[in-house]
């Protein structure tokens, strides 16, 4: 806690002194200071919040001679403002009133109950249902000479309690952050290591928080173990320092222990297939190149019935295991689900899963004592549904070990379910303060207080009837309002009949309101009962939360099993709906894909042309040639995606597929200037190529698309040739090498492990039709001018390009020209100049095309469609007979 000198408070009111003390402990955080029904911000916090949230900035009086800037948000809508702020990378300290205004002398006691930061979100209103939020700490390890030898990473999903550690090489930091995607990154004060731009909100914390010895002990205390050997973390150093800082920070933001952080996973780079940032981006696993969430592999696969399954899918896609045994186990489960008997059908299972709540995040809030009443009722209803869900699984588990494990983990925690059933009302209110949360019969005292409060109506009816009889006033009424409480209302003309025991409470224009000793006694009892009932309910609810804490490990077990079951069922649904097959695996070097299809592109088009892809010890590099837009990049990406899907455990879009070991997937596809990093397009391209040449192994899958195109023709050709040779001679990796340098098609003559394949197309006049079929052998041309014409390049430009192309081809045939002169003018005849504006292609339309343009297929009857087909055939034959191409 920060200590301020007495001078700092001179001239300030007691309330502002209280605020300044709290603000001093959170100097870099916006303080939401509770005042009645609002959270107020003061001074510079108010100005900043007004700017970020579009709030009204006011100024009320002064404190110590300084005008007090103010801005506020209503407490019932605070979550929407918090969501906006954390998206902007801001942190907010929530300062609540914890004292009773009625008994407080001076300012009501307040304290910060939690700090909301981008990486420590747990409230459902602040979280995306299908995205995990990670808080990450990084600590650099140095040798005795002060040279950085590794970077220790610790990252925590506070909403679920999942904690992971890793130690990586310094040059792997960008790839690790791209994979983890942390929302907030903790680094030591004074550290010189720069966090890559766009990696996440960065927060500096005291360097001593990263002490390795203290961090190791803090980890042991958190996990309640004597040593970390059982977690495989015995050799970690800097990662333990990072974990210590992370746990300290997370606990401080929550203001309490992290009871649900009870396990640890140490990640090793050899455990998963390596995917660098460029590969994740180019394969569009969870985000398109345009930055949208769809269409991606994730959006295609995500038919999960629970949000837990959707989040697990995202994790699996970014963490494909290298060991095929994990994939085979998952695919075995998918097969069992597809072959399930009628009483345990996949549709019935998925229908049951749709009723399941987000147990994972509810458990996290339960551990932090922030679970709301409907969290608990959802948890109860989910646990109550587990026996029926297990019955559906029981008919399947004999065929799949992983389903057997999931089934066992879905055993509902009986004591936890009993407590939730007895304590929580069937349909509780959203907030405890509203009452109606604790079930009737759970607490006798609460039931009695509720009876008093809820029976007010009958008492008032009886009292009104008695008083009408006693006084003879037929229109006498007994009523209640929040300002004056209970009262007896008598119209002005009947006041002479009022008995002596009536005491005037309020005078109105046309009536008088009275109170009697009997009504006053009842009022005190009723209002007191209501207040006491709410207080009792709050105390009981807090006690229920405490009583549920021992069941957190069981809740986490159930959540994990539900997520896995849901994801496996989603994989089975995709396999059935999209005609996918189970891949096989071998220990031999090779990849065999028969009639493979790009899963995402196939879903976007009416017809997709399937293609084969084959690698082996004698076939390691495929030189892919063919026209632009012919499908080279699609073919390359589909090969990588099918391989990744296989190792994730999904079925794959192919007739059959078999994979040998794969350790990494690299892609060098497309590029753009890195303006922030000061790198040109070509520099980005060469940097990615260098990483591949340095790191690819015989078990790596490499996608190289048009390497060398960012420089001069001969430089690019020379680089492409040398890179292809290196990949064959030194890396010996599986390589898909797309190029427009037709000189490279001679490479198989030198390296038998290289093979030529091409994407086919056919010309029609000066037009082109892409067949998207992969065939053996090299292509004969690139059809670049035809593609340019399809793109809408003006006809005069196309004509000029054809002439210049002929000249360049003639020039390149000369053995005396070391480099093509792209800017020398070819000889052009005068008559050619005169017709430079002529159209590049004949503009006579084909009669069949004209006929097709006038047709609305939706208006055709079956017989009309058949007649039209014959008519179109006649037009085509007639047109060809007239000598047209």
UniProtKB/Swiss-Prot annotation:
Belongs to the DNA mismatch repair MutS family. ATP binds at residues 626-633. This is DNA mismatch repair protein MutS. GO terms for cellular component: cytosol. The keyword DNA damage applies. Keywords: ATP-binding, DNA damage, DNA repair, DNA-binding, Nucleotide-binding. The gene is mutS. One of its GO terms (biological process) is mismatch repair.
């Amino acid at each position: 806690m920060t200590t301020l000198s007495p001078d700092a408070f001179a001239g300030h009111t007691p309330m502002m002194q209280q605020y300044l003390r709290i603000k001093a402990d959170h100097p870099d955080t916006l303080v939401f200071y509770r005042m009645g029904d609002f959270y107020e911000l003061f001074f510079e916090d108010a100005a900043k919040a007004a700017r970020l949230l579009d709030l009204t900035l006011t100024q009320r009086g002064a404190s110590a001679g300084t005008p007090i800037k103010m801005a506020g948000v209503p407490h019932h809508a605070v979550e929407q403002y918090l969501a906006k702020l954390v998206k902007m990378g801001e942190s907010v300290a929530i300062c609540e009133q914890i004292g009773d205004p009625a008994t407080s002398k001076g300012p009501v006691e307040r304290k910060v109950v939690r700090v909301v930061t981008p990486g420590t979100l747990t409230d459902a209103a602040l979280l995306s249902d299908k995205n995990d939020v990670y808080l990450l700490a990084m600590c650099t390890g140095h040798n005795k000479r002060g040279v950085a030898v590794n970077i220790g990473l610790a990252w925590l999903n506070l909403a679920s309690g999942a904690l992971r550690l890793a130690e990586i090489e310094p040059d792997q930091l960008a790839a690790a952050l791209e994979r983890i995607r942390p929302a907030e990154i903790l680094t030591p004060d004074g550290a010189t290591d720069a966090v890559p731009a766009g990696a996440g909100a960065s927060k500096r914390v005291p360097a001593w928080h990263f002490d390795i010895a203290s961090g190791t002990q803090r980890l042991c205390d958190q996990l309640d173990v004597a040593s970390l050997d059982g977690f495989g973390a015995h050799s970690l150093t800097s990662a333990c320092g990072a974990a210590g800082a992370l746990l300290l920070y997370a606990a401080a933001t929550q203001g309490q222990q992290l009871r649900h952080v009870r396990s640890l996973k140490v990640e090793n780079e050899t455990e998963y297939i390596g995917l660098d940032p460029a590969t994740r981006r180019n394969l569009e696993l969870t985000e398109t190149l345009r930055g949208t969430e769809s269409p991606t592999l994730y959006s295609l696969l995500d038919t999960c019935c629970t949000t837990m399954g959707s989040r697990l899918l995202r994790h699996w896609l970014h963490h494909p295991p290298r060991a095929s045994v994990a994939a085979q186990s998952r695919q075995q489960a998918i097969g069992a689900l597809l072959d399930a008997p009628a009483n345990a059908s996949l549709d019935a299972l998925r229908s049951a899963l749709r009723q399941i709540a987000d147990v994972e995040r509810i458990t996290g809030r339960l551990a932090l004592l922030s679970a709301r009443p409907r969290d608990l009722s959802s948890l109860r209803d989910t646990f109550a549904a587990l026996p029926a869900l297990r019955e559906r699984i029981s008919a399947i588990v004999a065929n799949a070990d992983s389903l057997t494990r999931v089934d066992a983990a879905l055993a509902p925690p009986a004591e936890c379910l009993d407590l939730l059933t007895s304590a929580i009302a069937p349909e509780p209110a959203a907030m405890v303060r509203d009452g109606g949360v604790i079930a009737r019969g759970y607490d006798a005292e609460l039931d009695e207080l509720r009876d008093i409060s809820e029976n007010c109506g009958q008492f008032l009816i009886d009292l009104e009837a008695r008083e009408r009889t006693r006084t003879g006033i037929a229109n006498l009424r007994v009523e209640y309002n929040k300002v004056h409480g209970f009262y007896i209302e008598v119209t002005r003309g009947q006041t002479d009949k009022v008995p002596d025991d009536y005491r005037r409470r309020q005078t109105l224009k046309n009536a008088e309101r009275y109170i009697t000793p009997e009504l006053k006694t009842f009022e005190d009892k009723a209002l007191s009962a209501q207040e006491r009932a709410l207080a009792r309910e709050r105390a009981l609810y807090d006690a229920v939360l405490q009583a549920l804490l021992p069941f957190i490990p069981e809740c986490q077990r159930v959540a994990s099993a539900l997520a896995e079951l849901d994801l496996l069922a989603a994989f089975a649904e995709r396999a059935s709906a999209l005609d996918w097959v189970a891949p096989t695996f071998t220990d031999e070097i090779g990849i065999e894909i028969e009639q493979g299809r790009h899963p995402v592109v196939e879903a976007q088009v009416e017809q997709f042309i399937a293609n084969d892809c084959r690698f082996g010890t004698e076939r390691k590099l495929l030189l892919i040639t063919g026209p632009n837009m012919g499908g080279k990049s699609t073919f390359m990406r589909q090969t990588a995606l099918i391989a990744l899907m296989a190792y994730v455990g999904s079925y794959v879009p192919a007739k059959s597929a078999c994979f040998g070991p794969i350790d990494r997937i690299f892609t060098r596809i497309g590029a753009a200037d890195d303006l922030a990093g000061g790198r040109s397009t070509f520099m980005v391209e060469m940097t990615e190529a260098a990483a591949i040449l340095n790191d690819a192994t015989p078990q790596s899958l490499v996608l190289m698309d048009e390497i060398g195109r960012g420089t001069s023709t001969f430089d690019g050709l020379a680089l492409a040739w040398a890179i292809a040779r290196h990949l064959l001679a030194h890396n010996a990796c599986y390589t898909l090498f797309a190029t427009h340098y037709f000189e490279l098609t001679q490479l198989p003559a030198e390296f038998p492990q290289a093979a030529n394949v091409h994407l086919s197309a056919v010309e029609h006049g000066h037009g082109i039709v892409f067949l998207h079929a992969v065939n053996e052998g090299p292509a004969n041309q690139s059809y670049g001018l035809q593609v340019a014409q399809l793109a809408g390049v003006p006809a005069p430009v196309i004509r000029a390009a054809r002439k210049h192309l002929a000249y360049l081809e003639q020039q390149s045939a000369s053995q005396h020209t070391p480099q093509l002169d792209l800017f020398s003018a070819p000889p052009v005849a005068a008559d050619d100049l005169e017709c430079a504006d002529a159209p590049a292609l004949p503009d006579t339309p084909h009669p069949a095309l004209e006929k097709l343009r006038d047709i609305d297929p939706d208006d055709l009857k079956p017989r009309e469609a058949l007649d039209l087909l014959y008519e179109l055939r006649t037009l085509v034959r007639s047109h060809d007979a007239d000598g047209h191409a």
